[in-house]
C-alpha cells in the first residue's frame, strides 16, 4: 500500500478489501508500526469484507487490482479462495478493470496453468520473481503475475 500511495496522484483513490477485521485493526495501530499512516491517508478506503464483493460492485472502475490472497494461485489454505484463481474469478477481475487496466496477482509459486487462464481471459501476462522485500538476500522469492487487460482482438 505504501508503494502504491507513493505513485498515486493526490486525486487518486485506493480501495483495500480485507476479509479479517483483526488485520485491519493491527494495521491501524500505530504502536505496531505496520501501516497506520497508510490507512489514515485520505485517498484510502478500507472495506472490511470480501474482495469479490468489491470487484462485483466496481465494474470498469479500477485502473489496477492487486490480489494478495492466501498463498497464491494453488497453495491455498482457506476454502473458497480458489474461486479467485478460476475462470469466474479472473473474469470478475477483468470486468472490474477499466480500459488498459492491470491486475497483479501475488503467489508463493509459479503456476503455468494460471498464466494460460489469464491469457485466455483477455490479458497479456508477465511473470516476475521478486524478493519479499528490498533488503532480502537469498532465500525465497515471490511470484507476481502481471496481467495487462487488452482490448478484444488486439495485443500490445
Regions found by a protein language model. Give the residues of each.
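Class I (Rossmann-like) S-adenosyl-L-methionine-dependent methyltransferase catalytic domain
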Residues: 112-115, 156
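C-terminal lobe and adjacent flexible extensions of AdoMet/dcAdoMet transferase-like proteins
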Residues: 145-156
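The AdoMet/dcAdoMet-binding core of the Class I SAM-like
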Residues: 1-97, 105-106, 116, 121, ...
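Active-site beta-loop-alpha junctions enriched in small/polar residues
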Residues: 108-110
Amino acid at each position: 500500500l505504501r508503494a502504491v500511495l507513493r505513485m498515486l496522484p493526490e486525486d487518486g483513490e485506493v480501495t483495500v478489501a480485507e476479509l479479517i477485521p483483526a488485520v485491519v485493526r493491527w494495521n491501524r495501530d500505530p504502536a505496531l508500526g505496520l501501516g497506520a499512516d497508510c490507512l489514515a491517508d485520505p485517498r484510502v478506503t478500507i472495506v472490511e469484507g470480501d474482495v469479490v464483493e468489491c470487484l462485483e460492485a466496481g465494474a470498469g472502475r479500477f485502473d489496477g487490482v492487486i490480489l494478495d490472497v492466501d498463498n497464491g494461485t494453488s497453495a491455498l489454505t482457506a476454502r473458497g479462495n480458489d474461486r479467485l484463481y478460476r475462470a469466474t474469478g479472473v473474469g470478475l477481475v477483468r470486468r472490474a478493470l477499466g480500459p488498459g487496466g492491470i491486475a497483479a496477482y501475488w503467489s508463493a509459486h509459479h503456476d503455468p496453468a494460471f498464466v494460460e487462464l489469464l491469457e485466455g481471459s483477455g490479458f497479456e501476462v508477465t511473470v516476475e520473481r521478486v524478493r519479499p522485500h528490498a533488503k532480502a538476500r537469498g532465500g525465497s522469492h515471490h511470484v507476481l503475475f502481471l496481467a495487462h487487460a487488452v482490448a478484444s482482438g488486439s495485443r500490445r
